[in-house]
Amino acid sequence: LAITSTDIRGLRRCISGKVRDVYDLGDELLIIATDRISAFDVIMPTGIPDKGRVLTQLSLFWFDLTKDVVENHLITADTDEILARLASLGVEDVESLREVLDGRTMITRKAKSFPVECVVRGYISGSAWSEYNELKASLPPRGGEGRGGVVLHGIELPGDLVESDKLPEPIFTPATKAELGDHDMNISSARMAEIIGEADAKVLQEKTLAVYKKASEYAASRGIIIADTKFEFGRVGDEIIIIDEVLTPDSSRFWDVETYKPGGPQPSFDKQYVRDWLLSINFNKQPPGPELPDDVVRNTADKYREAYRRIVGREL
């Protein structure tokens, strides 16, 4: 059964995003990853069973693996502790919430989030590939030796990359956060420094690249390529910490080492079945989204569970 909405009486829900419902607990937040799925920035009416659990359990796994690189916002994800905390806040009949909250919920520190998405790419794909192609097409051809380098948001890249190619070094390509229903806008590191200040921008860039390096080395040992991913950071007092989700199929492109072949798009462990089906019915990319057929739901749920199994090494 998919859980697509939550309602906890006696608590103030401060955010209902594409996937997560967030409740205000005073100094802390209660974050529930539902089974909602969005495609083309539209939330679908059908949920994907276990999706929220996969996102939460994978984030917990990565929080633990990367905590020596950067602190994170987690206080607890233990269901008994969460229910006890809710009871202490006057929420009635907390046991009835166990099934809804179990495995998909965290209590976290409340951080002031930076208004940027920290994107790191080890391979060229998605919006970066589209931008790279446009820039390359506008370059004058050079004599004899093909085109020169392409400068993407201030980063010089070779002029002969193909789609899904591994980049010489991972690159940091931040984006501005969009309102619900809009697309994030890619920006340069210099523009990010203007928005949040140079010192913080430097920390965010360093932490992003360091977490990616550690995570991609681990993932490679499990036969998974992390092509790109995005992180969000926040500040608690003087400390900069990682918040939201980390290295999940919703925030990252995971590819299978076995099937990786540059020169086109790669199959990934995410909502590709949903996107493909929507394109096949000529979905107009405007809300409301259509109900998803059972096979699309089942295949997508399997992909999310497989991502967890491949990375963590056990079943969800």
Question: Model-predicted segments: where are they?
Answer:
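A short mid-domain helix/strand-loop element embedded in enzyme catalytic domains
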Residues: 166-198
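Active-site loop/lid in soluble adenylation, ligation, and acyl-transfer enzymes
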Residues: 2-139, 148-178, 285-291, 295-316
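A long amphipathic alpha-helix within ATP-dependent nucleotide-binding catalytic cores
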Residues: 196-227
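Acidic, low-complexity intrinsically disordered tails
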Residues: 144-145
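C-terminal helix-cap and adjacent tail motif
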Residues: 138, 246-307
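Generic recognition of stable, solvent-exposed alpha-helical segments in well-folded globular domains
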Residues: 53, 57, 199, 203-210, ...
